[in-house]
């Protein structure tokens, strides 16, 4: 037998074992699933085969990366508790993501054993993966009733590939991102911490306490944890921090009843409904924050005398950017700060960055991989989506400058120490509601700033975001960072004609990356006009 024939035989035997095992996880979804910005999302009852097959591809990915760990998170984030999802963590951004997402879709949607065999064999050969190569997958899941079951299907997919796995159990999505990155870099100059939950909590608590020692804390922070995994993890973190430095009260923390997850609470509810979550009452101007179901998004809010004030991802981004620019200036360092947003960013925030802070702003398509990639263009990239998902990215070049920088005064020394510790506090691997909460609290304490003062950085242009169910979201294709429709043909021209009738009008339509729907976003000079513009665009979709 020739080497080629021997290789084919090994591949065939390997694939046959996978396909045979896959029979235990019958494909029940009748429509083509597509790996979107949030991975796969669907009714949980449809995801057993998807979980198994995604576990297989995660193993392939790790083998392609010479055994580097790949994360696989079971979560549907802010979606309803009856839904679930699967997302590969930390890796697709470093490879040709569109190619591997296409591989995933082919495998997940294969209808027969023969089709699955052809798909798997083709991927192994195209990617030049040798069956049985070293591979390792980290698995985590949220608090949904179906998550642990789906995680076991993932693990079965990993095991049949003869890959190693580590089941971290209940985690926030950002924690799994941290575990993967920490494991990849542990023991190297790029190490971010110990690749364990304890390592994560110790890293955050040490940095936070260092930054808050001697600072005045203004009252308790009320945290709406969306009845999700973030409730358990913020409570665990609090054990590592002096309670005088971290006065918190947690509501919507019932993770033992999965049906309550994201039910009239959580960051997505608060932002889209523009009202406080159930279960929370607070004094006027008290600091309140909402996480989403897997704790990668955060928004702040407060009760005014006669109104509700929302401080979304745009406002958090503004707070972070202003603080970092002032801090970097105080160190004497020459570092470029840049902002990355999506089309959902309020137009007033973009103007604040460009005209007040005088920093460059990039607009990219929604989704972590797009924001993360764009932020790498700067020494310090601050990227946020309006929904509260974002973080700060620091380049290797910037870190080298910080390490070698010679200070000329005690003030520069203190500023440099603070800057280094801020970069220790943030989770550069993913938007993280917990670390972003900590940094907001640090900045407000350092600036001796109230929520009301923070909210006055700029005044939002009135906007309206509407979720609209449609028969087929795939017909809505876009260009220009998803701000303009290409298809259905002629629809963009109709939207442009409507927008032109409104003072300060701006609007766009894009299909959701996480739900079977499209989203309509509109801005105009008044609340009523933005609402009217959005509703009139919705009429065009039906």
UniProtKB/Swiss-Prot annotation:
A matching Pfam family: AMG1_II
Positions of the catalytic residues: 77
Cofactor(s) this protein requires: Mg(2+)
GO molecular function annotations of the record: metal ion binding; phosphoacetylglucosamine mutase activity
Glycosyltransferase as UniProt keyword: no
Signal peptide: none
Residue positions where Phosphoserine is found in the record: 77, 82
Cofactor note: Binds 1 Mg(2+) ion per subunit.
Reaction(s) catalysed (UniProt annotation): N-acetyl-alpha-D-glucosamine 1-phosphate = N-acetyl-D-glucosamine 6-phosphate
Pathway: Nucleotide-sugar biosynthesis; UDP-N-acetyl-alpha-D-glucosamine biosynthesis; N-acetyl-alpha-D-glucosamine 1-phosphate from alpha-D-glucosamine 6-phosphate (route I): step 2/2
CC per GO annotation: cytosol; nucleus
Protein localization: Cytoplasm; Nucleus
EC number: 5.4.2.3
Transmembrane annotation, as ranges: none
UniProt keyword list: Carbohydrate metabolism, Cell wall biogenesis/degradation, Cytoplasm, Isomerase, Magnesium, Metal-binding, Nucleus, Phosphoprotein
Positions annotated to bind substrate: 385-387, 510-514, 519
EC class (word): isomerase
InterPro entries: A-D-PHexomutase_a/b/a-I, A-D-PHexomutase_a/b/a-I/II/III, A-D-PHexomutase_C, A-D-PHexomutase_C_sf, AMG1_II, AMG1_III, PAGM
A GO BP entry: carbohydrate metabolic process
The protein's role, per its UniProt record: Catalyzes the conversion of GlcNAc-6-P into GlcNAc-1-P during the synthesis of uridine diphosphate/UDP-GlcNAc, which is a biosynthetic precursor of chitin and also supplies the amino sugars for N-linked oligosaccharides of glycoproteins.
PANTHER family in UniProt: PHOSPHOACETYLGLUCOSAMINE MUTASE (PTHR45955), PHOSPHOACETYLGLUCOSAMINE MUTASE 2 (PTHR45955:SF3)
Name used for this protein in its record: Phosphoacetylglucosamine mutase 2
Organism, as annotated: Schizosaccharomyces pombe (strain 972 / ATCC 24843)
């Amino acid at each position: 037998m020739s080497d080629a024939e021997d290789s084919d035989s090994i591949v065939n035997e390997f694939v046959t074992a996978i396909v045979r095992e896959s029979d235990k996880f019958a494909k029940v979804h009748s429509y083509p699933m597509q790996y979107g910005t949030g991975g796969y999302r669907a009714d949980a009852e449809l995801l057993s085969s998807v979980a198994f097959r995604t576990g297989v591809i995660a193993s392939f990915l790790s083998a392609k990366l010479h055994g580097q760990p790949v994360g696989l998170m079971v979560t549907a984030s802010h979606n309803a508790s009856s839904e679930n999802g699967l997302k590969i963590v930390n890796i697709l951004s470093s490879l040709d993501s569109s190619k591997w997402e296409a591989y995933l879709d082919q495998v997940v949607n294969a209808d027969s054993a023969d089709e699955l065999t052809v798909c798997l064999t083709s991927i192994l050969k195209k990617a030049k993966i040798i069956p049985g190569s070293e591979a390792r997958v980290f698995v985590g899941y949220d608090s949904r009733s179906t998550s642990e079951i789906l995680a076991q299907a993932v693990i079965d997919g990993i095991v049949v590939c003869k890959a190693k796995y580590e089941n971290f159990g209940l985690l926030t999505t950002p924690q799994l991102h941290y575990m993967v990155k920490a494991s990849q870099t542990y023991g190297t100059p790029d190490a971010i911490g110990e690749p364990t939950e304890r390592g994560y909590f110790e890293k955050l608590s040490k940095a936070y306490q260092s930054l808050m020692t001697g600072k005045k804390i203004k009252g308790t922070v009320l945290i709406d944890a969306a009845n999700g995994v973030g409730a358990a993890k913020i409570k665990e973190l609090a054990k590592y921090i002096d309670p005088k430095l971290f006065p918190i009260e947690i509501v919507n923390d019932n993770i033992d009843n999965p049906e309550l997850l994201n039910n009239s609470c959580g960051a997505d509810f608060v932002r889209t409904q523009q009202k406080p979550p159930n279960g929370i009452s607070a004094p006027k101007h008290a600091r309140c924050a909402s996480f989403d179901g897997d704790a990668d998004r955060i928004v702040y809010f407060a009760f005014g005398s006669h109104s509700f004030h929302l401080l979304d991802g745009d406002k958090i981004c503004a707070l972070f950017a202003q603080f970092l620019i002032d801090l970097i200036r105080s160190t004497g360092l020459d570092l470029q700060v840049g902002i990355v947003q999506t089309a959902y960013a309020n137009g007033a925030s973009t103007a604040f960055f460009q005209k007040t802070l005088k920093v460059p702003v990039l607009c990219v398509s929604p989704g972590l991989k797009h924001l993360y990639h764009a932020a790498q263009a700067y020494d310090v990239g601050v990227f946020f989506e309006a929904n509260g998902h974002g973080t700060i990215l620091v380049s290797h070049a910037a870190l080298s400058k910080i390490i070698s920088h010679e200070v000329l005064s005690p003030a520069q020394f203190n500023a440099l120490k603070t800057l280094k510790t801020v970069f220790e506090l943030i989770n550069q691997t993913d938007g993280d509601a917990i670390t972003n909460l900590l940094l907001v609290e640090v900045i407000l304490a350092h600036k001796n700033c109230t929520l009301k003062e923070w909210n006055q950085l700029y005044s939002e242009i009135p906007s309206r975001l509407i979720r609209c169910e449609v028969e087929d979201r795939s017909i809505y294709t876009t260009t220009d960072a998803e701000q303009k429709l290409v298809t259905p043909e002629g629809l963009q021209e109709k939207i442009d004609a409507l927008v032109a009738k409104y003072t300060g009008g701006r609007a766009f339509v894009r299909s959701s990356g996480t739900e079977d729907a499209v989203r309509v976003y509109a801005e105009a000079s008044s609340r009523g006009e933005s609402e009217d513009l959005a509703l009139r665009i919705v009429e065009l979709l039906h």
